[in-house]
Amino acid sequence: MRVLAIRHHDIDTVGFIGEAFEARGASLAVHLFPDEGPLPALDGVDYVIVFGAVSSVNDPDPWIAEELAWLRGADHAGVPVLGICFGAQALCAALGGRVERMPDKEVGWFTVESADEDAVPAGPWLEFHEDHCLLPAGATVLARNDSAVQAFRIGRHLAVQFHPEVDGPLLKRWLDAHTDAETRKLGIDPDQFLADTIREEPASRARADRLVATALAIRDS
């Protein structure tokens, strides 16, 4: 299985999600977009993962419109996608939904109400977002909480608002990209956030593995 992972920041990693695909024998190629140039052709690609971004899907940057068009192309070509955070919102917008700003950012560890906890565990999951999805026609909600739709499927695609890939080192890079004051303004103690993330790593790895199993089951359904 050839998997193409799209990152948007050089500090990001594929984390537990990439690990779970590789454990299933996947060959993983990673493309940093837009820094490494145009999105690759999908010839020979069996699965796509689109990770998070600081940008909003509604920002006017040309690369965002390019990515939405590319995702529509993946859908038309029958290439399944796992969208994570920005990737989930991009998939939503590409397929006819809308993305809107939330009243408050959702940052930290949160549980979700899952329609099927074997498919999408209740968590907790790490969240780091301020936009949310208004789903396109044909999408099915798999999990939600009071803030947002947290997981949905549409066609052969799976999208999750949370970050199942994140381990301690990745979160530390994210926190280091913000000042301590910026993080605390969100009501987050960065040291505690990092400690909680490190403590959750074994369970996070297992939840990410379960999510990849669900993504592949949706692909095959």
Q: At which residue positions do the language-model features occur?
A:
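Short, charged N-terminal beta->alpha structural module
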Residues: 2-24
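Amide-donor transfer/coupling interface in amidating biosynthetic enzymes
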Residues: 5, 100, 114-221
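Cofactor-binding loop segments of dinucleotide-utilizing enzymes, especially the Rossmann-like FAD-
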Residues: 6-8, 33, 86
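Flexible gly/pro-rich beta->alpha loop and the following alpha-helix that scaffold active-site loops
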Residues: 18-82
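Catalytic nucleophile loop
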Residues: 74-98
